[in-house]
Amino acid sequence: MRVFLGGTCANSEWRKELIPMLNIDYFNPVVSNWTPECQDEELKQRETCDYVLYTLTRVFSTYSIAEVIDDSNKRPKKTIICITNEKLKNGKLAISSQDIKHLDAVGRLAERNGSLYFKSLDEVAKYLNNK
């Protein structure tokens, strides 16, 4: 089994936290130099992976929000969204309480489309490792 690790990229550490918890194969789309070939590979992986995970840790993850809603419509049974409020290096939380409500609405929308919605990386890892 393989999972695509989509979602927030810029200055987010969630992949470093999740990857050691996974007992399955994964595709990490984050690269230092994004090219059209990288975009093509990402689209291929979203099609071929057993699950596509979108973890949102910042409210400005607008493209990731579009991707998760797109996938929750096109392939709801293999789409997972996780909204988690990451702690920044300065000790503050990355997402305000108001913005958490907005992202929660995105998660609930994806869930209504038939996708899975989790609120922690632990829940995501437990689910994927038990599939």
What kind of region is each of these model predictions?
Residues 1-131:
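Conserved catalytic or regulatory cores that recognize and/or transform ribose-phosphate-containing ligands
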